[in-house]
């Protein structure tokens, strides 16, 4: 591991002698400058939609000199997104609450990739109108939003206990349907 959302370990990265480091816009600018001062190329991605991801794969393949190998992968990704968009047009939208943590409880807002990915899959982020990347929300706000599915920001193997805590509200459509 060479870092997280807040900071990167410059010494570890330099020791690994990478050909390229991929960052996001919230990486500390001084750390990005420090990497560049060591002659390490840095690519910053700000993927906010599934289409941005395919564009990034294309750009990274170009930077890595593997465009030919990446072309069929990118084409398959774009075809899959087109198929999802077509399928979504004939399906009913599902109201989704994407919970990132519980203390404090926060979710994803409008400018997030997760909101766009949910939309592509036929979901509607119940807090997708909030123009904040990770807004704090209350239990009452979630109950009022009546989500039909509640997602946790982790994989099933590390399922957080707070996801099951929603079972205390059986009137919430997501709980009634077992969509936790």
Question: Which residue ranges define each predicted feature?
Answer:
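N-terminal ligand-binding lobe of clamshell/alpha-beta domains
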Residues: 1-180
């Amino acid at each position: 591991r060479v870092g997280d959302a807040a900071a990167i370990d410059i010494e570890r990265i330099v020791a690994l002698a990478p050909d390229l480091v991929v960052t996001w816009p919230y990486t500390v600018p001084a750390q990005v400058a420090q990497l560049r001062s060591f002659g390490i190329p840095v690519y910053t991605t700000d993927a906010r939609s599934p289409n941005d991801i395919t564009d990034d794969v294309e750009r990274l393949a170009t930077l890595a000199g593997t465009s030919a190998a990446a072309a069929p992968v990118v084409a398959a990704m774009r075809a899959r997104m087109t198929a999802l968009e077509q399928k979504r047009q004939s399906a009913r939208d599902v109201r989704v609450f994407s919970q990132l943590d519980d203390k404090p409880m926060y979710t994803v807002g409008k400018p997030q990739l997760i909101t766009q990915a949910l939309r592509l899959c036929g979901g509607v982020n119940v807090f997708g109108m909030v123009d904040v990347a990770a807004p704090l929300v209350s239990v009452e706000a979630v109950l009022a939003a009546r989500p039909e599915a509640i997602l946790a920001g982790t994989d099933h193997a590390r399922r957080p206990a707070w996801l099951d805590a929603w079972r205390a509200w059986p009137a919430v459509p997501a709980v009634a349907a077992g969509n936790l």
